[in-house]
From Swiss-Prot:
Protein name in the entry: Neuronal vesicle trafficking-associated protein 2
InterPro entries: NSG (IPR009431)
GO cellular component: cytoplasmic vesicle membrane; dendrite; early endosome; early endosome membrane; endosome; Golgi cis cisterna membrane; late endosome; lysosomal lumen
Family: Belongs to the NSG family.
UniProt organism field: Bos taurus (Bovine)
Length: 171
């Protein structure tokens, strides 16, 4: 153990006392200022940034970027184009997803069609396809006009049995 409050310069002056049980060993040797710091130089050279740049012979001409910069730019633009295509594909599939139709209807040509109409026109000849689409368009027009003609405050029978005024030809 080391005895506290002992002076390291008096190391050899006193013999270690046996009765204390401590040894007087200096923990830190004294430091001299001359050893801590190198002498300051008389001339200091400060290197600036312009010393490291090569002389530019073509100051007025356009400097062509490196090929590596073009490669990175092309890769980034291709990645963005790919991601844009993926987003458009997902949005397209979301809008054209096969919708479910009520019971008794079949989904054809982006519409829910009654299964009986589909079975009737699919069993006929191929030229009946045009008639099939005509029936479907009339069906949807009739459905729209019926929904507009009948208000919630009128009964359906009153609207159907009302006499219509005769149409006059002319202006």
């Amino acid at each position: 153990m080391v005895k506290l409050n002992s002076n390291p310069s008096e190391k050899g002056a006193k013999p270690p006392s046996v009765e204390d049980g401590f040894q007087t060993v200096p923990l830190i040797t004294p430091l001299e200022v001359n050893h801590l710091q190198l002498p300051a130089p008389e001339k200091v050279i400060v290197k600036t940034r312009t010393e490291y740049q090569p002389e530019q012979k073509n100051k007025g001409k356009f400097r062509v970027p490196k090929i590596a910069e073009f490669t990175v730019t092309i890769l980034v633009s291709l990645a963005l184009a790919f991601l844009a295509c993926i987003v458009f594909l997902v949005v397209y599939k979301a809008f054209t997803y096969d919708h479910s139709c009520p019971e008794g209807f079949v989904y054809k040509h982006k519409r829910c069609i009654p299964a009986s109409l589909d079975a009737y026109y699919s069993s006929q000849d191929p030229s009946s396809r045009s008639r099939f689409y005509t029936v479907i368009s009339h069906y949807s027009v009739a459905k729209q006009s019926t929904a507009r003609a009948i208000g919630p405050w009128l009964s359906a029978a009153a609207v159907i049995h009302e006499p219509k005024p005769p149409k006059t030809q002319g202006h």
